[in-house]
Amino acid sequence: MKSTVASALLVLAGTAVQAQSGPWQQCGGIGWQGPFTCVSGHTCQVLNDWYHQCVPGGGPSPPPTSPPPTTPPPTSPPPTSPPPTSPPPTSPPPTSPPPTSPPPTSPPPTSPPPTSPPPTSPPPSSGSCPSTPGGLGSGNQRLPDPFTFHNGNTVTSAADFQCRQREVSSLIQQYELGQFPAPPQSVTSSYSGNTLSITVSDQGRSISFSVSISGGSGSKSPAIIAYGAPSIPVPNGVATIRFNNDDIAAQQSGSSRGQGKFYNLYGSGHSAGAMTAWAWGVARIIDALEKTPAAGIDPTRVGVTGCSRNGKGAMVAGALEPRIALTIPQESGSGGSACWRISNWQGQQGQNVQTPAQIITENVWLGPVFNNHANNVNALPFDHHQLAGLIAPRALYVIENSDMEWLGWTATYGCMAAARTQWEALGALDNFGFSQVGGNQHCSFNSGKQSAELNAFINKFLLQSGGGTTSILRTERNHGSFNLAEWTPWNVPNLR
């Protein structure tokens, strides 16, 4: 009997020891019911109100508070209890045949690694670009062709593709994201004590905000702008710029519309959704870095990252701000790396996935104009493979989770596989990566499976030291009856 009791006490003691979150795991946030402390050598930091994460550095931190929500929690929060370390898929494996065109697990680069700095895709000039017809045009149940203009003309050159990018950007802003403002009249900045202070003035109004800068080395270090805080490991030699995107545009709930410093400057009725406002904030950070050498950052080697809701924002920032050298959206799902049409298709298959009709009820990430189109996205002349395509040929590394049904595991894979054709057309496949793996919590970076990929992208496009494969199209999920070829009925031109 004593032996049994002793064994039970040992089990309980072991359980208590384990009641801490591990590296890159969740450790707090609204609705969180798991451990609030981190294992030794990690600190619980706040990414946003909904998600706190254990990151390397420091000793165990005190338990962060988890305030009760003042509004109903969203329908896509991080897990409310810690999942197993290697969770099975949340739906039974598909019984249909495997895809007719399975993705390569990690295809080799189709061209040699670049020996010069990566392309930067400057904003296309409007001088010789065709005018865009008004209206939505004809609907399309499949993904719209990124190589055909809205007027039906075909893209036949790299210059044409820049015009097409300009057209797509305009259409996405008009029908989904809201207007991305032109550069403001004035941006001033100063740097002191690892804080970059920024003041923006436009049309008689001014706002100020600041970001913190840590890490890096030398007077012109590359940097990654992290929405909230980084949920990926940032290597030595690369600075981290922590951007409080909620300060620029609030994202507490559907009642947050028009709140934040962006709207103080441009008015609460501005058409921009929160993600567009955040992208504007990123642009102003880069303005400030260009004006403030004392910050020690090379503004031509800046990346952007975020996870979940902030990952959606990172994708939009990369699409709207051409000075970003590397975009790393992590588990962004619907509104980010997923295509609306494929998310709807998944829902029609009985899967629990975030759809466009649902996302507009959850938050204010998109412009209010999207409320008019969320129930009929087949009428839109674009989808998110083209949002991603606004980044081409700049570098994009998309991190997704093959175990999370809500993110749209097929919608993200299919959408980014379609997006990849734009890098292919430009001869820039080495600048595109999509990696969808499982066995980790939401927003918990899977170091065992993705560190080499992440490091290869950072080395090549920020540190500019080369090394590693950066042409990646990888998924660990069987996508069943999904047939990529049926969703991408276009030929890929040679625009090199």
UniProtKB/Swiss-Prot annotation:
Protein name: 4-O-methyl-glucuronoyl methylesterase 1
Residue numbers annotated as active site: 308, 442
GO terms, biological process: carbohydrate metabolic process; lignin catabolic process
EC nos: 3.1.1.117
UniProt function note: Glucuronoyl esterase which may play a significant role in biomass degradation, as it is considered to disconnect hemicellulose from lignin through the hydrolysis of the ester bond between 4-O-methyl-D-glucuronic acid residues of glucuronoxylans and aromatic alcohols of lignin. Cleaves native lignin-carbohydrate (LC) ester bonds from LC complex preparations of spruce (softwood) and birch (hardwood), containing mainly hemicelluloses with partially acetylated glucomannans in spruce and partially acetylated xylan in birch.
Organism of origin: Sodiomyces alcalophilus (Acremonium alcalophilum)
Cell location: Secreted
Gene Ontology, cellular component aspect: extracellular region
Short motif GXSYXG catalytic site motif, span: 306-311
All copies of domain CBM1, residue ranges: 20-55
Similarity comment: family membership: Belongs to the carbohydrate esterase 15 (CE15) family.
Binding residues annotated for substrate, in chain numbering: 312, 354, 362, 406
Disulfide bridge partners, by residue number: 129-163, 307-443, 339-415
Leader sequence residues: 1-19
Keyword Hydrolase: yes
Region (Disordered): 57-151
Catalytic reaction(s) noted: a 4-O-methyl-alpha-D-glucuronosyl ester derivative + H2O = 4-O-methyl-alpha-D-glucuronate derivative + an alcohol + H(+)
A Pfam family hit: CBM_1
Biased composition (Pro residues): 59-125
UniProt xrefs under SMART domains: fCBD
Keywords for this protein: Disulfide bond, Hydrolase, Lignin degradation, Secreted, Serine esterase, Signal
GO molecular function: carboxylic ester hydrolase activity; cellulose binding
Gene3D superfamilies named among the record's database cross-references: alpha/beta hydrolase
